[in-house]
Amino acid sequence: MDEIILTSQERLKIFKALCEHKNLTFNQLVKETNVQSNKLAYQLHFMTRKNFLVHAKGTYALTADAQQRIPYFSQILKKEVGVLPVILGIVRFKDKILLLQRKKMPYKGYWGLFGGKQINGESIPETIEREVFEECGLRARFERYNAIVHERLTLDNHPKHSFLFVITTLAVDSADAREQTEGKVAWFDFIETLDGSVSKVIPSDVYFLKTYTNSSAHIDHVVMSEHADDSLTLNG
């Protein structure tokens, strides 16, 4: 099939129609999107080849893999920048706290708490335990949730990044932390970290430590099941 160029708006219309309907025939897609049939056929063929679509019994439907990516595709196609959820971990051993010096923006070169993005299918404790191990080699154990905080980073008073932090506490049995690939790691005196004696610590992380180290928060974890007949059940 010869390459046919679709505009971003045409691709968005096709994707939007497939998100809003579980199954659509080709003619229904033509009606829903108002995209020329040759362009539509090309895009559907491309999406099927990339395993984004399944074509069966004369209808097209998003694959389960594609449905997992709906929130991300929507932001890209609409050119939206969303809030990024990040799991943070407070790792202490005796009177020390373990910090990571960031190698990447934002906050490149600053020391801060361990953390990262959640992989689909992980629980929050699984995420932060994995992140700590990947970043310093320690097998940390999740202990509790401390807080949920929304942080916005601005540049010249204009929004640059927006984060939703889930702050947690983890326990470790040793101080044998080693640098991996994410940046340098080091133990610092906890009190000196709070009073500003340690240079280049992310200011909001210092605030989190001062405010939430001894706090506890409740976060519910629920699992929903979607069935072939479109019914939903809440698992216990």
What are these regions (language model features)?
Residues Q118-R141, E151-S204, N235:
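Unchanged
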Residues T48-G58:
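A short, conserved structural fragment
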Residues T59-L88:
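Acidic, metal-coordinating catalytic segment for phosphate/diphosphate chemistry
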Residues T7-L12, W111:
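Short, leucine-enriched amphipathic alpha-helices that occur as contiguous helical runs
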